[in-house]
Amino acid sequence: MNKGFALNNQNMSGPIFSDDSVERELELLKSEANLVKWQAPNGEMFTMTLPHTVYPPREDTFFLAKCLLKLGPGKGRRCLEIGTGSGVLSLMCHRQGWRVSACDINPMAIASAKNMLLNNQADDVIIREGGPGPSSDGDVQQWSGSEKYDLIFWNMPYVRINEFDSHLGPMEEAALTDTSSQGLVSLTLMQINTSNILKSSGVGLLTVGEHFDLDELLSICAE
């Protein structure tokens, strides 16, 4: 989900930042980073230092972590995390024996995740900049690489605008908003399918907002 400026509404891949938004983003970048501690469902503790522009682990992170742990040890299988944010789920998967790749549209998230992974002897995790979005933003291999994965997961954007936390800046708020004209779930599934990056026996885990019902999700998957 590549966010940025656009010349017209038809080409828009994300919200246009106002001068106030840019100023707020710069102020947050100057502020002191937060020390964040998070406990995974299996009891493991993770400690990270996050700038105010990177989404911290929350309840939705814990929910997705539970689903990932149910898949069992990675045993060398490949997984891709889209929108890695803090990088904590990628690190958890690495500790579970997965060969991990990850991507994010936020360069600050990439820097934070790389730093945490390096400090936890997981610098073999591959992190790329980018994510699902219009073809004009680049091809899928830009953010997925050329590998085929046994698992692809994403804690997808679904937070309502009035639920944003002051911890976040405009860049990360943009990453939490589904602005795709066809719906980000549909777009992501289509790009995963057409690019053939998920093995035929692979698993995809995507969190979605409460506004989706089961029939709608089944219809999207069937397409």
Which residue stretches match the model-derived regions?
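Conserved SAM/SAH cofactor-binding pocket of Class I
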Residues: 65-166, 189
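Conserved Class I SAM-dependent methyltransferase catalytic core
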Residues: 183-223
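SAM-dependent Rossmann-like transferase core, predominantly class I methyltransferases
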Residues: 9, 14-96, 110-112, 134-139
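Glycine-rich, phosphate-binding/catalytic loops in enzymes
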Residues: 96, 168-172, 222
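A general structural signal for well-ordered alpha-helical segments in protein cores
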Residues: 61, 86, 166-173, 187-191, ...
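N-terminal amphipathic/basic-hydrophobic helices that include classical n-h-c signal peptides
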Residues: 1-4
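Mobile active-site "lid"/loop adjacent to the S-adenosyl-L-methionine
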Residues: 156-186
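Short alpha-helical
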Residues: 56, 88, 107-108, 185, ...
